[in-house]
Amino acid sequence: MEALLEGIQNRGHSGGFLTSCEAELQELMKQIDIMVAHKKSEWEGQTHALETCLDIRDRELKALRSQLDMKHKEVGILHQQIEEHEKTKQEMAMEYKEELLKLQEELSRLKRSYEKLQKKQLREFRGNTKSFREDRSEIERLTGKIEEFRQKSLDWEKQRLIYQQQVSSLEAQRKALAEQSEIIQAQLANRKQKLESVELSSQSEIQHLNSKLERAKDTICANELEIERLNIRVNDLMGTNMTILQDHRQKEEKLRESEKLLEALQEEQKELKASLQSQETFILEAKMQEKLQTTLKAVGTQQSVERPLEDCQKERKYSSPGQGVLDNVLSQLDFSHSSEELLQAEVTRLEGSLESVSATCKQLSQELMEKYEELKRMEGHNNEYRTEIKKLKEQILQADQTYSSALEGMKMEISQLTRELHQRDITIASAKCSSSDMEKQLKAEMQKAEEKAVEHKEILSQLESLKLENHRLSETVMKLELGLHEAKEISLADLQENYIEALNKLVSENQQLQKDLMSTKSELEHATNMCKKKDGEIFNPAHSRAAGFKNAELKPIHGQHRHDGIKTEQYKTGHHSPRGQTLDSIDPVARGPSPLSSHISPGSSTVSLPSNFLFEAHSLPSVLDINDVNFSDSLSDCMNDQEEFVSSGSLPTSPLGSIATRFLEEEELRSHHILERLDAHIEELKRESEKTVRQFTALV
């Protein structure tokens, strides 16, 4: 009984201790939950701030990428425009080439037709000698053709103006490209400023993020310290829990001892019950004996009478010890019942306390398990947060590295762009200088060409005046021929003097023209030498072509002048000794008779006409050289026929035809050279424009 009371008191004291520990544990757990929730909210806020910063950076990068895509699209559009412009230029060049081919075909066709006519005329002149009227009609027809050629030369002049307009348009395009380059430079400067501003803002953001990282590190360190403190507290709680468990084990041992006592009491109770049963059986046997005795009494009175004393004695003998035993048994039964009731009450109370203690133990164990799980979860969250922080640190380091690499790349690109812009500025300046020099050269050449054109116009006006004078002289000669028979009284000496004066006048005019031709030729040679110094590569094939044309022209001339050796000799040396040829042409006139002189004067007029015609056709291209030579050959054949028609001593004619053909060749070469230089200048401008476009595309 004393052991049971001590166990109950111990259980009561242990139950109070458990309730106080439970309250402390609950308070600690609440504090831990509050701190963990607070730290979790702080970490979530920090992670959210970092995510927002990263989102902002991503948006800025996307905006920059979109701007770069727009710039790439603009560059592609500019490429397309440049390609379209080049295609249009190529198409225009092809059209011009086709037009030139058509003109060359027309010229070749005219050449063939002219050769056919020339052959036909040669056959007619060789077969039959026609009159002067036919010659004049032929000359008029040829003058018409020369007028046509003059119209074509005007067309060529228009085409030259078109080329000049193209040059001006190319110059305007170059200026537009220069303006575009300036605009692109301004855009690059703006982009550079934007990049610098973005760099400054990104540096400030990086500093801000670094400060945030330092703060987060400080908070993490504080959290780690707090977690260590909580771990220490949890270890203390674990120690208290272990003490509680030890107390619980002691209480369980006490319960086992009480159970053993209960088992002993139950065994005593069983023994008491067995003794009670034996006593009850003994009492029943006594009662049965009493009943038997009553029956025996009823059976026989004798026996009842005889043995009353014996029965009484026996009953006394049996009752005196039986009553003591019964009293003892009854007292033991009462005590056992009371002790049993007390034990049952104690057992019920102990069972209730055991149930409450087991429930509290289970609750504490569950709470401990929950706390363990929460601690594990906290450790897992802490590890996750650490991994996330490490990842964020790595991402920030990667972002810093990428940003630094991007900044270095941008700096390199900006430096490269500045170098390229500097080089492009240098090239643009050099191109501007070269273009200005070319413009100056073109202006000087145009001025020279205009001066030459003015000189040629003056020469043409002089030739027209000479033509009119020759026509007037031919009319006078015709009148003299017609009135020769009527004016027989006029002396032969006067006619010779008048004719010699006219011839001397013509010779002086021819000499003046030759001097003008020599001066223009020297100027042309000087201009061609200057052009050769500047553009030797362009003029070499032209000179070779002109030499080929010249050789091709000299061969038929030698063939056509095979009847007169003196004429071919004069043709070969006509350019070098014009004065001697004119004197040679004058001497036979002075020696010849008077009727022949009247026939020679129209020939001299016809000789002066082709020179005029050939002077008028100085601006034609090099394709017409053979036509002009054939024309001079036809005129020489006409003069041969006229000399045969005179029938007395063939007189040599003036070498003005050969000089004029030579001058026409040189003028045609000069015009061809000018056209080639214009084409070369246009090609140079195209190459410069393509070069600037390539530079722009390379920069973009």
Swiss-Prot record:
GO terms for cellular component: centriolar satellite; centriole; centrosome; cytoplasm; spindle pole. Pfam families: CEP63. It comes from the Eukaryota. One of its GO terms (molecular function) is K48-linked deubiquitinase activity. Residues 593-603 have a biased composition (Low complexity). The keyword Coiled coil applies. The keyword Cell membrane does not apply. The modification N-acetylmethionine is found at residue 1. Residues 73-283, 343-533 form a coiled coil. GO terms for biological process: cell division; centriole replication; centrosome duplication; DNA damage checkpoint signaling; intrinsic apoptotic signaling pathway by p53 class mediator; meiotic telomere clustering; negative regulation of intrinsic apoptotic signaling pathway by p53 class mediator; negative regulation of protein K63-linked ubiquitination. Keywords: Acetylation, Cell cycle, Cell division, Coiled coil, Cytoplasm, Cytoskeleton, DNA damage, Mitosis, Phosphoprotein, Ubl conjugation. It is found in: Cytoplasm, Cytoskeleton, Microtubule organizing center, Centrosome; Cytoplasm, Cytoskeleton, Microtubule organizing center, Centrosome, Centriole; Cytoplasm, Cytoskeleton, Microtubule organizing center, Centrosome, Centriolar satellite. Signal peptide: none annotated. Residues 570-603 are annotated as: Disordered. The modification Phosphoserine is found at residue 278. Polyubiquitinated via 'Lys-48'-linked ubiquitin, leading to its degradation. Deubiquitinated by USP36, promoting its stabilization. Transmembrane segments: none annotated. Belongs to the CEP63 family. Interacts with CEP152 and CDK1; these interactions recruit both ligands to centrosomes. Interacts with CDK2, CDK5RAP2, WDR62, CEP90, KIAA0753/moonraker and CCDC14. CEP63, CDK5RAP2, CEP152, WDR62 are proposed to form a stepwise assembled complex at the centrosome forming a ring near parental centrioles. Interacts with CCDC57; the interaction is required for their location to proximal end of centrioles. Interacts with FXR1; promoting its stabilization. Required for normal spindle assembly. Plays a key role in mother-centriole-dependent centriole duplication; the function also seems to involve CEP152, CDK5RAP2 and WDR62 through a stepwise assembled complex at the centrosome that recruits CDK2 required for centriole duplication. Reported to be required for centrosomal recruitment of CEP152; however, this function has been questioned. Also recruits CDK1 to centrosomes. Plays a role in DNA damage response. CEP63 and DEUP1 paralogs are both involved in centriole amplification: while CEP63 mediates mother-centriole-dependent centriole duplication, DEUP1 mediates de novo centriole amplification in multiciliated cells. This is Centrosomal protein of 63 kDa. It comes from Mus musculus. The gene is Cep63.
